[in-house]
Amino acid sequence: MKNKSVSLVFWVSLVICTIFVAFGEIFPKQLEKLTQNITTFIALHFSWYYLLLVLVILFVCVYILFSRYANITLGEEGEDPEFSLPSWFAMLFSAGMGIGLVFWTTAEPISHAFKLTPIHKAGTQSAINDAMQFSFFHWGIHAWAVYGIVALVFAYFSFHKGYPGLVSATLTPLLGEKAMRGPLGGAIDVLAVIATVTGVAATLGFGALQINEGLHFLFNVPSNFTMQVILIVITTILFTWSAWSGIDKGIKTLSNINMLLAFVVLIGLFIVGPTLYILNTFTNGLGNYIANFFSMSLRIPSGGQKFQWLQNWTIFYWAWWISWAPFVGIFIARVSKGRTIKEFILGVLFVPALVCFIFFAVFGASAIYLQDNHIADIAKAATETATFATLQHYPLGFVLSLITLLVIMIFFVTSADSATYVLGMLSSRGDINPKSFVKVSWGIIMALFAIIMIYTGGTQAIQNLLIIAALPFSVVIIAMIWSLLKSLSEEKPRNSNKVLIKHRDPDILEYRSSKHIDEN
């Protein structure tokens, strides 16, 4: 059989990404200005679109959860899940949140309460209440709904219908063979690859900044661009090795270890920190989150600093989740084979969101407690060092900081590790075992992307590029949802026979119901 594992999508995507890296290296200031102008335009004209889209995605997930399709198995009928529940949760959580969770659990609530606030005056009790509810909002079920719907589409078409693991293949019910084989399908897959590279490179950029600042804070290691490049190179070698060894050996092991370490820090801070204050903050924040769920979901201030806050936080986060959706979605689908749609949605939508709430309550409340009681000025700490600045004021602070630094490093590896696998799959005609050469190539490109982002403007440049990359791919997500609902509506009752037939391409096998056979 002819070897076709490396597709044209790989080479086209690689060329586009290389051109971007070269442009950023030669014209960094021009790139920074260009991305800032585009981001400003998108924020002014498309904020409403991002807010409505993410809310609609959440509604679709809930609808499917309670629909007659909820008991469909994402795989062959009667197939058992490949991974245990604890390993499954650990892998989807590590891939879905990664470095960002550690980066923002302290910095975001502090910023909402004492810096640029969403509604009330900074430093007031109302602003502190807002801080936790908006942190829950940004990292809660909205984010996981975006991941979940894309993952569900992939899992349904790949494991239930037997299509190849490509974004274009999921659009077959809408566009026919063109979506899977023609230029339009190739363009869609290239767009998915670029969105993934951008989203993951942004996380690598955040990770390099925080690891560098953590080393500087704890050990006075120099904090500069050179050190950040060194960190990216070292971690690139690590996650490339992990991706080379495969999901079961690499990602699964690292994810399990990292979740254990993350919970060690979480429980440790909960015990040595202001425990009662944390519990009260969590309860109050959860209540406010539920009470103001829809107002937060659809809130657009008229202008000024409040609109700037919306752009810097909510729109940025919604864009981040969308740009991460192809990567996280495909990875979650890959590790969710054998689960029912109901089990899948419940697991992906609610369990990780609750864990995020707990992390934000423990870390965020511990920081707010220090600030509000004038014990330490955490608000003046850099975003990258806010967590370390908080931990040092509690017993065992240095030990917890060391473990936190290790957690960030492993999150760094697991996020990029998962992404190299997904990028390899997208650029290898959906091959679930992409060539090591392809995975290594994407690891290098993501590292270069992250370096260019830091070089051209640090955190702000990263945020700008995420918002830009998410807009075109959001249209693809809408089409994927439409395609899923169309295909689900054609599902026969679960007692219909399934027959294995061959697709036009003899290398691709597809499961279809007897209804589809009649139609053909």
Language-model regions: role of each:
Residues 1-4, 28-42, 61-80, 132-137, ...:
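Membrane-water interface regions at transmembrane-helix termini and the short interhelical loops
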Residues 1-127, 267, 481-488, 514-519:
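N-terminal alpha-helical transmembrane segments of multi-pass membrane transport
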Residues 33-39, 66-85, 110-133, 156-183, ...:
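Flexible loop linkers connecting adjacent transmembrane helices
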Residues 180-182, 192-339, 346, 351-402, ...:
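Membrane-embedded translocation segments of transport machinery
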Residues 48, 85, 123-131, 179-190, ...:
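Membrane-interface alpha-helices at helix entry/exit sites of multi-pass transporters
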Residues 2-11, 15-25, 58-63, 97-101, ...:
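Helix-loop-helix module between adjacent transmembrane segments
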Residues 16, 49-66, 262-273, 355-365, ...:
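Hydrophobic alpha-helical segments of multi-pass membrane transport proteins
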Residues 498-520:
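Long, low-complexity, intrinsically disordered cytosolic termini of multi-pass membrane proteins
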